[in-house]
């Protein structure tokens, strides 16, 4: 879980920008989007195989 403490003399916008940066670096948003809907194991395998094929070529 990302945590950001507002520093002394720091605007809320700057703190929010730092928070968004830490969340994006940790991959939290991508993980939530990936887990939003259930994905059958066969579909997971198919996507993994397609991603590997795409990386190769």
Swiss-Prot record:
GO terms for biological process: translation. It holds the Pfam family Ribosomal_S21. GO terms for molecular function: structural constituent of ribosome. Keywords: Ribonucleoprotein, Ribosomal protein. Transmembrane segments: none annotated. The keyword Ribonucleoprotein applies. NCBIfam families: S21p. This is Small ribosomal subunit protein bS21. It comes from Lysinibacillus sphaericus (strain C3-41). The gene is rpsU.
């Amino acid at each position: 879980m990302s945590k950001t403490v507002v520093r002394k003399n720091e605007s809320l916008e700057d703190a929010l920008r730092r928070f968004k940066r830490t969340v994006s670096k940790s991959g939290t948003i991508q993980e939530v989007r990936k887990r939003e809907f259930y994905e059958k194991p066969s579909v997971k395998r198919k996507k993994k195989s397609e991603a590997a094929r795409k990386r190769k070529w």
